[in-house]
Amino acid sequence: MPFFQQLHITDTYVYTWQLTEAVAQLRVGLPLSQGEEERLCALHSEKKQREFLAIRHLLREAQLPTTALYYTSEGKPQLEGQYISITHSHNFVMIALSLRPIGIDIERCLPRILRLASRFTPWQAPSDMDELTQIRAYTQLWTIKEALYKIADFPSVRFYEDLQVPHFEPLAPRQQALITHPEGNKAYKGQSFFWEGYIWSMVSEE
């Protein structure tokens, strides 16, 4: 199944591709510039190549030329005239397009998040919360913080300390988010979406 979903959320468009195709299938009907061909060939992982091609299919779904996408020296994706954020997890690839800064992240809900939780958040799940809910809650927190990291325009942002979800309500679809930094604090709004086995979150300026 190729193109999976298009969502319009306020002033943001989110496009999702469910990756089921091989590289050869993804190349069909997708002309690439010489620069894009060189970048594709430089990717030695088939998974990375498939993601690269899926992103360009999504740009075409958004009626944008694939060559409109470029990256800063820090590796952040850029478009002229609007903001873009890109994420992928297992067989899903997503892009978000907006006229204001936007961050997006998708993650598969896996038990290993419980081992990693103390490394990225001070929040602790209540002792009476069942394991499945804990996995989903920590995955939600991770996606919000990852989306915050992508939207951050401060230098040297610390993932644990500076990216915060100060009043986290597990599995609530809307969350407050905050970047604290010596150059100033900035508040954001977070939205989370729950698919079977996956959680993705989007962060934008308030």
Language model features: what each stretch is:
Residues M1-E206:
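Core catalytic alpha/beta fold that binds nucleotide/phospho-ligands
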